[in-house]
Regions:
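A short alpha-helical cap/connector motif
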Residues: 1-172, 177-198, 202-258
Length: 258
């Protein structure tokens, strides 16, 4: 598909070797990494086989997407399961997705919403989202998902202008990395205090920890990770699941000001 300027998500870089232990610095130097679990292929296979509850429809969509050139843009099944659980835990009714691709993550979120829940999906690709629509119809969720084909920043700006501020419970950001900061700021206006903003690719296949990687996408993710770490407006955690999932919970503005 032809490139579009800062509108649709990009494929992740190839997996890079782990940064050498000798590069460890700061807080990491004080941690006994031998106590951390290494997720090798055997253990990951166990995780998928024994703990992932993936609906058959989602498994078929994942298999179809895997045959596509941009398959690496799809989230992993255990991440999809986590996102569905998070949506239920915060009792979300209205959700946002920035970057839809073939609709796998949207399915995970929409299936977790109540019957009267709504998911607004932002993407620019008719080709990719036509696959998504097909699976959404089969799942009986087409009326629960509002797909808006336009640059995500424009769609979010229109929602804000229309008075949807704090009108959403959950947002998932997985689109063009150079605009991640903009999407984050827009979602902070749209997601209610106590809601959740989930940001994909926060570890970017290890590139964020490699000083030799200074491309625009890596720099943007690095900068946003650091910004959110220091952002008093949210509670946050970066989870090493999938390609790194950063969770930010907007705080009540009154509590932040006090």
């Amino acid at each position: 598909m032809p490139k579009t300027p800062a509108r649709s998500r990009r494929a992740s870089p190839r997996r890079r070797p782990a940064v050498a232990a000798s590069r460890a610095a700061g807080k990491a130097a004080a941690i006994d990494t031998s106590r951390l679990l290494a997720l090798d292929d055997r253990l990951y296979g166990y995780l998928l086989d024994e703990t992932v509850r993936e609906p058959q429809l989602m498994a078929r969509l994942r298999a179809e997407t895997r045959r596509m050139p941009n398959a690496s843009m799809q989230i992993s099944p255990e991440q999809a399961q986590l996102m569905g659980l998070l949506v239920k835990l915060i009792e979300a009714r209205r959700a946002l997705e920035i970057g839809t691709f073939t609709g796998y993550s949207a399915l995970a979120v929409a299936l977790a919403l109540p019957a009267d829940g709504r998911l607004v999906c932002c993407d620019v690709s008719e080709q990719w989202t036509e696959i998504a629509r097909r699976y959404w119809r089969e799942a009986g969720l087409a009326d629960r998902i509002d797909l808006r084909l336009a640059p995500a920043a424009d769609t979010l700006a229109k929602l804000i202008a229309a008075g949807a501020t704090r009108g959403f419970d959950f947002a998932f950001i997985d689109a063009d990395k150079e605009n991640y900061d903009l999407y984050y700021e827009q979602c902070l206006k749209l997601v209610r205090p106590g809601g959740l903003i989930a940001i994909d690719n926060a570890l970017w296949h290890g590139a964020v920890a490699d000083p030799a990687c200074n491309d625009a996408d890596t720099a943007a993710i690095r900068a946003l990770n650091r910004k959110i770490r220091d952002d008093a407006r949210v509670d946050m955690v970066l989870m090493p699941i999938g390609d790194g999932l950063l969770l930010a919970r907007p705080r009540d503005p009154a509590a932040v000001a006090s």
